[in-house]
Amino acid sequence: MSLRFNLIVTPFSNHRIRNRRETFPAQEFPVATSKSAVKVKCNLITSTDLVGKVREKINGKVDNSLEVPAIHPVDIPSNLCMIDTLERLGVDRYFQSEIDGVLEETYRLWQQKEKDIFADVTCRAMAFRLLRVKGYEVSSDELAPYADQAHVNLQISDVTAVIELYRASQERIYEEESTLEKLHAWTSTYLKQQLVSGTISDKKLHKQVEYYLKNYHGILDLVGIRRSLDLYDIDHYQILKAADRFRTICKDLLAFSRQDFNNCQAQYQRELQLLQRWYEDCRLDKLNYGRDVLRISYFVSSAIIGDPELSDARLAFAKYCVLTTCIDDFFDHAGSREESYRILELVKEWKEKPAEDYGSKEVEFLFTAVYNTVNELAEMAYVEQGRCVKSLLIKLWVELLTSFKKELDSWTDDTALSLDEYLSSSWVSITSRINILTSIQFLGLKLSEEMLSSQECTDLCRHGSLVVRLLNDMQTFEKERRENTKNSVSILLEAPKHEGAITEEEVISKIKEIVEQNRRKLMQMVYQRGTIFPRKCKDVFLKSCRGGYYLYSNGDEFTSPVQIMEDMKLCYEPLTFHPLEANNGGNKN
């Protein structure tokens, strides 16, 4: 048996390669080459049977029927399970038109309170989550019957249902959604108790619960997909009686997903080599200070912008992560105040100088790295956007370096700041804004000046950046206090008594509340339909926010990488696929 893929090969550079067809045996994967990831040609009409269509598509069968029958309600549970599976395995992009059709019909049935959705707790929770994430107006009040654990009759075997309720509760986007708040409280407690008591006998399910509870909003696509491939288990959906339908496609879908992941890995490894060459060309390897974040920057960038077709966007994001970190470290520790000012002056002038005019090798290397990278990206963006965006890119650098300067001045002069004064510039200095607004120039979408200067764009930047900034502050305030620098935690701790000085525990609690408020507002904006910003762009803001949770929820992974080193190894090791595993549809050990 073999899997037949329709391949559209996307190169690493801007040069295009013609399409071709290949057949890969299901258990004999090709050696990774410089070609991009597999892309299956999507030319199927939305069908009543998503499970069947997935089977047909990954086996190269095409239904060109013009008939688009209505989806029978009985198909909805299995179709929702298939959507969730495709998303968790990272191959949903190949079936987007089919997924959109199923969700449109699901929303119609949701409005009618169709019993096949509402009669089953797992199906209702999953439908709510998938619809809300896609921007459909669904009320959390429909989950009110499950808000109180006392009203839910749970058996030991109901862990899967509780997981779905827990995941649904994480999609709270309004402050007043008390149903989701209550739901989150008891489901998280219940799942933790199940872990502690050892009542989850299924080892894969046990690991899945651990993973969700550890840092749900910090689950990056790349890491989450790799975990899901390891923990893939068809029996996860047995409560919806969908397992029998899934079992026939289980091994094909898993083989297809692993093949796709391996192809993405091959492209990521090639791009990492390109990034390394850029790093050396910029002479950043000659800087004798700061954090070595090249691989970490690329890893985070590939987890935020994972689509193999978006190589330029991913590399732009990674380059900016590296550049902003190098300059941030220079402002913080390595450079003098005058040298730091000099970098800002040079960016404002935007002219190359003779080497002796820079004042130091470090200033020369940093400015020329920014200068050459921005000029190169501006040329590429001109092709993508059909207009010159260089002035925007330079403006973003001036804004960032100005925020660095403000922070440097406040630390050096020991200026007393209020929390609002600190946050007014620190949301820019966390670098999310410049990284995102530069990289989205390469998503294949035309972005007008009106869009980029809109209040929506500013708010997306601010809410997402504040989440990352405050998460960072909570993990680094001890170190920064020793270095006599300030952040939101130390500012609140040092507040005068008449302003309501509070304990460290109370400060952390207050900042977590601000983080949650901004995260919910960001999710609300990203999910909202009909706005000036395309959803594809808004998703980058949300995924960057997840990157902040990933890096700063349990330490400072960017400065002292621990978990990220394990995940990098896990994500860059090629997946293997064993015949026995395929035949069994996965095991539970």
From Swiss-Prot:
Protein name from the UniProt record: Class I diterpene synthase 2, chloroplastic
Top-level taxon of origin: Eukaryota
Residues reported to bind Mg(2+) 1: 328, 332
Entry EC number(s): 4.2.3.-, 4.2.3.189
Enzyme's top EC category: lyase
Keyword Membrane in record: no
TM region positions: none
GO biological process: gibberellin biosynthetic process
Organism: Vitex agnus-castus (Chaste tree)
Tissue expr: Mostly expressed in trichomes of leaves and fruits.
Swiss-Prot/TrEMBL cofactor(s): Mg(2+)
Matches recorded under Pfam families: Terpene_synth (PF01397), Terpene_synth_C (PF03936)
GO CC annotation, single: chloroplast
Sequence motif: DDXXD motif, positions: 328-332
Family classification: Belongs to the terpene synthase family.
Record field: catalytic activity: 9alpha-copalyl diphosphate + H2O = (13S)-vitexifolin A + diphosphate; peregrinol diphosphate = (13R)-9,13-epoxylabd-14-ene + diphosphate; peregrinol diphosphate + H2O = viteagnusin D + diphosphate
PANTHER family: CIS-ABIENOL SYNTHASE, CHLOROPLASTIC, ENT-COPALYL DIPHOSPHATE SYNTHASE, CHLOROPLASTIC
GO terms, molecular function: (13S)-vitexifolin A synthase activity; 9,13-epoxylabda-14-ene synthase activity; magnesium ion binding; terpene synthase activity; Viteagnusin D synthase activity
Binding site for Mg(2+) 2: 328, 332
Alphabetic keyword roster: Chloroplast, Lyase, Magnesium, Metal-binding, Plastid, Transit peptide
Cofactor binding comment, as recorded: Binds 3 Mg(2+) ions per subunit.
